[in-house]
A protein has these predicted regions:
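C-terminal outer-membrane/trafficking sorting elements
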Residues: 631-715
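Catalytic-core environment of secreted peptidases
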Residues: 180-185, 372-375, 382-383, 467-477, ...
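Hydrolase catalytic cores
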Residues: 204, 227-232, 246-254, 330-343, ...
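C-terminal subdomain of the subtilisin-like protease fold in secreted/lumenal serine endopeptidases
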Residues: 52-56, 252-264, 268-271, 286-293, ...
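Active-site core segment of subtilase-fold serine proteases
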Residues: 145-147, 159-201, 350-435, 532-545
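Autoinhibitory N-terminal propeptides
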Residues: 5-14, 18-145, 151-154
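Subtilisin-like serine protease catalytic core
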Residues: 140-238, 253-256, 284-288, 292, ...
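Catalytic-core segments of hydrolase enzymes
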Residues: 253-356, 401-521, 587-588
Length: 715
């Protein structure tokens, strides 16, 4: 596997307790998210759209909602009988496309437990600029394996596919068109209407792109079957699309990996949402989800506070950037830590202007579109959500001028505590900043507890952090740039930190190469001309010109891990999420960059360390050997070889009757020989190069059905 895509490191983990779905009706007596109240009451609601703009939804609008249910078939049938679209995702979740006016009618269904408000996710490409991180593997070193992901389905749910890029030629078994549904088709779409920067093209090539003549920038699982799904990145779309990928793979008897290089800052960050729980239910033996952690490692989008006095509120200053966000739009959520379904906190959005505090009345809050509060039925935690143009709040409170500060005001009993998050990605420049205005003070936020919502927070998703495969790149014009991601080999400065709130689930689980990565570019993207400086290679293929370039992000680290897991699944198709975590825990490469880890070899920045393709494969084969099946295959591709400058490690891919490992000099003289009797899959032998004088040798592996010879250079 002599690829320019650097694969080095590994992962693993502890068991993850499943969250039993708990949905109750509390004091309001309603069975829908409080954010839907305005629509139910005949008013408008603000939502985030796929292009990061704020969109107004009216009671007459059609919306997509996920519905927690007791009887999925009965609820689906009732919705369809009313003339609307519905699809069963799991036995506990139905996705429905309904007019907002139908919410109350749907809630009357006895098998409906709770109607969730729509959520919007976004791509997790590093915001500063695209970077490339492809490191050339030194000649004579690297990983040589017959495992290519053959027979494994890799589903990429993303935005920005150049479908005709030769990296995907002959590899795509199904497409998902630009829709909010999960329908797959054999027909290639004419274009991806959601292609702004070619994100999906870059991602899919890292995971599994083919080698194109004239380019060295190809993927990891080059034999895998691809399903390319262009998604609107709403929760309902992702749920339906993930189910379709799973259904296709399982119908064809194939293991599968779903790559999710997207997420959101807003949510409880505890894996409790209906979306997280039901996406986890789709996973199982031979079915793995891999998700990007996020790119907020440098930002102050999170805050944790504890009430220290019954009489003194805590303030959080939600700063906006006038250069990027002149309308002062704020999207923020606050979540209490108590899980007893009680409202311990009094939470209000307020304004400080000069030295005066403007505090809304309860009536003003009730009428404030974009503000909602309540008890979440999935985790029993109190929450408050704010999504509005802050000028609206200023108008209601009769605040003049534009230099005012919008704050959360939180009161409670001593010892009460909460987490808060602010979206500074879709609304660039927003963050929690320190403030001191008269008697009103606020401390700055931090970058902790930033596991990406909607993908990485899924209980059974492998959450991936990013380290730097390189720190510089040279473009087509020969100009060399510093990518601005930090030191080569270190954690990418943008990589989001864990942990998950209130859970022992390891998030992240592992780090993959995501800083300065070179991969396929989409020439069809809306921003293609703006990315000319980051193009590193162009090739001519079948009468067309195609491009490769540099991007950075946990979006790029994630498909590297997805591709490696596909190799492991080819070797052992019965691997589960728990098996993958065990592999990562046992084989994660923890060098000096990774630093201090806990008793489980984990920390909140790196997870279990850098992913290690070879040692992970060894562990996967060992697990296969422990399955109780002991068939001797005498295969034609018996070994995987990890070639390093000081040793060659030989790993048996299957059970063999025997093997001989021999080293000859260029005169044909036998220098070293080892006979291995009945090696089992996962058996390893090490050839120590320190035992040989500098020079060129021939390394020969012989089994019943094969004989393989490789050149070995000792320096």
């Amino acid at each position: 596997m002599d690829k320019k895509l650097l694969i080095a490191g590994a992962i693993a983990l502890m068991s993850v307790p499943s969250l039993a779905q708990q949905v109750k009706v509390y004091d309001t007596g309603t069975k829908w998210d409080a954010r839907l109240n305005h629509l139910v009451e005949g008013r408008t609601m603000q939502v985030l759209s796929a292009n990061k703009s704020t969109q107004t939804v009216t009671p007459q609008s059609n919306i997509s909602v996920s519905v927690s249910v007791n009887d999925a078939a009965a609820v689906e049938a009732a919705i369809k009988a009313a003339g609307y679209e519905a699809e069963i995702i799991t036995d506990e979740l139905v996705v429905a496309h309904i007019p907002a006016s139908y919410i109350t009618t749907l809630a009357e269904q006895p098998n409906v437990l709770f109607i969730n408000a729509p959520r919007q996710f976004h791509k997790l490409m590093h915001n500063v600029r695209p970077e490339t991180g492809v490191t050339k593997v030194t000649a004579g070193e690297g990983l040589e394996t017959p495992f290519t992901g053959k027979g494994v389905v890799i589903g990429v749910i993303d935005q920005g596919f150049e479908y005709k890029h030769p990296a995907f030629k002959g590899r795509v078994v199904r497409y998902g068109a630009n829709s909010g549904g999960g329908m797959l088709t054999e027909r290639m779409p004419t274009s991806d209407r959601l292609d702004d920067v070619g994100h999906a093209t870059h991602v899919a090539n890292i995971a599994a792109g083919s080698k194109v003549e004239g380019s060295d920038y190809y993927g990891i699982a080059t034999g895998a079957d691809l399903i390319l799904v262009s998604s609107k990145f709403t929760d309902t779309a992702v749920e339906a699309q993930a189910k379709s990928i799973k259904d296709y793979a399982e119908k064809n008897g194939q293991p599968w990996v779903i790559n999710m290089s997207f997420g959101s800052i807003i949510g409880p960050h505890d894996g409790s949402t209906s979306h997280d729980q039901n996406m986890s239910k789709l996973c199982g033996e031979g079915g793995i989800m891999v998700a990007a952690m996020g790119n907020e490692g440098n930002d102050k989008f999170h805050a944790y506070r504890e009430i220290t006095s019954d009489s003194e509120p805590v303030y959080l200053y939600m700063k906006t950037d006038n250069n990027y966000n002149p309308n002062k739009i704020i999207l923020s959520e606050l979540w209490g830590t108590a899980t007893d379904a009680q409202a311990h906190l009094t939470i209000k959005p307020c304004i400080i202007n000069g030295s005066r505090l403007y505090e809304p009345t309860d009536e003003q809050l009730d009428n404030l579109s974009g503000f909602s509060t309540g008890i979440d039925p999935y985790n029993n935690r109190q929450y408050a959500r704010l999504h509005l143009n802050s000028q609206v709040l200023a108008s209601i409170l009769k605040v003049t001028g534009t230099s005012y500060k919008v704050v959360w005001q939180v009161s409670g009993k001593q010892g009460d505590s909460f987490h808060a998050w602010i979206d500074g990605s879709n609304y660039y420049g927003n963050n929690f900043m320190a403030m001191s205005v008269g008697k009103y003070k606020a401390h700055s936020g931090d970058a902790e507890y930033m596991v990406g919502e909607g993908a990485a927070t899924i209980g059974k998703a492998i959450a991936v952090a990013s380290y730097n495969a390189a720190s510089r790149f040279t473009n087509l014009n020969g100009s060399t740039y510093d990518a601005g991601v930090g030191e080569t080999g270190d954690i990418s400065n943008f990589s989001s930190h864990g942990p998950l709130v209130g859970e022992a689930t390891p998030k992240p689980a592992v780090a993959g190469p995501g800083g300065t990565v070179l991969s396929a570019f989409s020439k069809n993207s809306a921003q293609f001309e703006n990315y000319r400086s980051y193009q590193v290679q162009k090739v001519n293929s079948e009468g067309g010109t195609y491009y490769y370039g540099m991007m950075s992000g946990t979006s790029m680290a994630t498909p590297a891990v997805s591709g490696i897991i596909a190799l492991w699944l080819e070797a052992n198709p019965k691997l589960t999420y728990e098996n993958i975590l065990d592999i990562m825990k046992a084989t994660g490469r923890r060098d000096n960059h990774v630093g201090k880890v806990d008793a489980n070899n984990w920390n909140a920045t790196w997870g279990f360390g850098k992913i290690d393709a070879y040692n992970g494969l060894k562990k996967a084969l060992e697990m296969k050997g422990q399955s109780g099946i002991d068939e001797t295959l005498n295969s034609e591709a018996p070994v995987t070889i990890s070639k390093n400058h000081n040793e060659w490690r030989v790993l048996f891919n299957n059970n063999e009757s025997f093997a001989t490992l021999q080293v000859f000099n260029t005169n044909g003289q036998l220098v070293s020989s080892e006979y291995v009797d009945a090696p089992r899959c996962g058996t390893e032998r090490v050839v120590n190069l320190a035992n040989f004088a500098p020079g060129v040798y021939l390394f020969k592996v012989s089994t019943t059905a094969s004989s393989t010879t490789r050149k070995l250079v000792v320096k």
